[in-house]
Amino acid sequence: MDVLYSLSKTLKDARDKIVEGTLYSNVSDLIQQFNQMIITMNGNEFQTGGIGNLPIRNWSFDFGLLGTTLLNLDANYVETARNTIDYFVDFVDNVCMDEMVRESQRNGIAPQSDSLRKLSGIKFKRINFDNSSEYIENWNLQNRRQRTGFTFHKPNIFPYSASFTLNRSQPAHDNLMGTMWLNAGSEIQVAGFDYSCAINAPANTQQFEHIVQLRRVLTTATITLLPDAERFSFPRVINSADGATTWYFNPVILRPNNVEVEFLLNGQIINTYQARFGTIIARNFDTIRLSFQLMRPPNMTPAVAALFPNAQPFEHHATVGLTLRIESAVCESVLADASETMLANVTSVRQEYAIPVGPVFPPGMNWTDLITNYSPSREDNLQRVFTVASIRSMLVK
């Protein structure tokens, strides 16, 4: 894997810097590394593809070295280099695709394609000169079963979940109280509602709670907490739990009271915040508990009182909500996030070449399914294919 990264890094630098008019002295070190790559690869043969519709391709290497010059690189020099670069880039691209479409239930962190296994041989280590990628660093750690650490921006840690629970319901669905939520990606939105605006509740207050368990532990997380849930701020028609009918939700937004968010690890509270909004941090957690209250306003103008009458019909429904968004965090496991295209890269290649469903990944690389059942086998395979996708993205956008 590290050899594949070094190949890609060398080729990227060569493609960017070996251009007509450049002083040879400015790229002499790069050309020396480029020639070392050619020397190491010459005389070797590889085969890629042969799974799904990914075609079988045979690769052989017999290239001349780039020479030295005292002056600028001319058009002939650059054209010779380009022919070599293009072949190598095509080879790396196909090795990456061949690796990204394969999976294994055992030791899925290790190379699975014949071509990448061959590149792992000792003689190709002479190519290896650069392992500065976070993915390569963590792949090496995971391969040795040591602790890894990925930094993510808006990590997709929450499987998609959109539902509701009713703490009070009636057959006519005209006086409901409960909670509805939408968890997806890096964001939780939860709303508590009471059609009667807590008129018969103790102290005219309704208590709500929403607990979310993560599939992986996050550390040093920067989080945004807001006293609102905008996705639940407009009228909608909702299917009943049994699917037999529908009910109408017409929210009027109030500010939540006594808001508390707890971050827990193995059932122990690590961080707690009360009535604190904006940016917060959490050190180490695998569970988030949100609690908040809806309080009937003790003093109301006539216009507000008309929204919340003392008896039915309740045409407007008192609603309070919270939004929790994980902006950045560190995780030992690889995840899809907002700043990278690894999941899309892997999924698109598997779809384009009609790769059959294997023993590890769900059909279509469905992320909700994958993260919901994030087994050690899936973790190993996902880290490997994401690492390869990161290498491929250096050369192929």
From Swiss-Prot:
Processing after translation: The N-terminus is blocked. Sumoylated with SUMO1 and SUMO2. Sumoylation of viral proteins seems to have a positive role on viral replication.
One cellular component term from this protein's GO annotations in UniProt: viral envelope
Residues reported to bind Zn(2+): 153
Transmembrane residue ranges: none
SUPFAM superfamilies in the record: A virus capsid protein alpha-helical domain (SSF48345), Viral protein domain (SSF49818)
Miscellaneous note of the record: The VP6 trimer contains a zinc ion located at the center of the molecule. The zinc ion is not essential for either trimerization or transcription activity of the DLP. Zinc-depleted VP6 has an increased sensitivity to proteases.
Amino-acid positions noted as binding Ca(2+) in the UniProt annotation, renumbered to this chain: 266, 286
Region (Interaction with the inner capsid protein VP2): 62-73
Pfam families: Rota_Capsid_VP6 (PF00980)
InterPro entries referenced in this protein's UniProt entry, alphabetically: Capsid_hemagglutn, Rotavirus_A/C_VP6, Virus_capsid_a-hlx_vir
An MF annotation (GO) of this entry: metal ion binding
Record protein name field: Intermediate capsid protein VP6
Protein location: Virion
Known function: Intermediate capsid protein that self assembles to form an icosahedral capsid with a T=13 symmetry, which consists of 230 trimers of VP6, with channels at each of its five-fold vertices. This capsid constitutes the middle concentric layer of the viral mature particle. The innermost VP2 capsid and the intermediate VP6 capsid remain intact following cell entry to protect the dsRNA from degradation and to prevent unfavorable antiviral responses in the host cell during all the replication cycle of the virus.
Sorted UniProt keywords: Calcium, Capsid protein, Intermediate capsid protein, Metal-binding, Ubl conjugation, Virion, Zinc
Family: Belongs to the rotavirus VP6 family.
Quaternary structure, from the entry: Homotrimer. Interacts with the inner capsid protein VP2. Interacts with the outer capsid glycoprotein VP7. Interacts with the outer capsid protein VP5*.
GO biological process: one example: fusion of virus membrane with host plasma membrane
